[in-house]
Amino acid sequence: MKIQKLLLAGAVATSFVAGGASAAEVTKIGLAVPNLSANYFIQIKESVEEYASKKGIKVITVNANDDSSTQVSQVQDLMTQNIDAFLYIPAGAAAATVPPRLARRAGIPVVNVDRNAETEPGDTFIAGEGVKSAYKVCSHIIDLAGGKGEMIMIHGQKGVTPEVNRTKGCNQAIAENPGVKLVADQWSERWSQDEGFSIAQNLLQAYPNVNLVFGQADGLAMGAAKAVAASGADHRIFVGGYDGDTGALKAIKQGVFDVTATQSTRAMGRLAVDSAIKLAAGGMVPKEQIIDAVLTTSANVDAFISDHP
């Protein structure tokens, strides 16, 4: 774990090797989040607010409750509140380009976190690496199943950056294992535990031989694990998740499901604030700042429970 923290610290530090802006040049930051029901977004929000507060910066946070039109209206309002920088996590793919455009018209730098729009990207994009990490999660559950079986994949919100990358990574793992067949995909709207339960319940009934489930977020995986427990299946079903939510880490320790990829959500929040400060001062930051997630099982989960990155 100490080695991993050093790697994370290095990844963050290398983004800021040239120059630096004073926090005194930024007094107010706007933060737009898709929802505050997902632990992943809660951790980013808390990290941004705590770190900004230490630098004397006020953060105005708006929660779209997963509604793109609501988020656009909220961002329009943020642009009237004299913010110095805008931290943006799109609520969906459909309207993801509008808020950055509004901010640029107002001369406000944009830091996209977790999700980016190809046609209207942020001035910098901060995210956890998704393809390689999803590949590792799916490879792990496939290995647990002996390289054979039927899989269902429960996706996040269709078309957003994490969903696209995690799908790609898991599909790569499936392609490398001819004994595994992906029998069903289904997309969620909110990446939630309730959706994970209902989707998995329906798919397990339709495909009773399934022995592999990949939920593209820990909420989906935990819901799927509950559906597995309720299914009465006479064979072992291995479940993988993604994100390293605090509740999910404890569930892995308890054996509720098998594996996740823990993201450095708190490091991402701090990096977003530092990037905003630098951009507002006219400094340069990389177009993309990507931090690796870490494969997490019962063997190493304790370290992440005690000190989430």
Roles of regions detected by a PLM:
Residues K2-L7, A11, S15-A18, A23-P309:
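A residue-level marker of the well-folded mature domains of exported/periplasmic proteins
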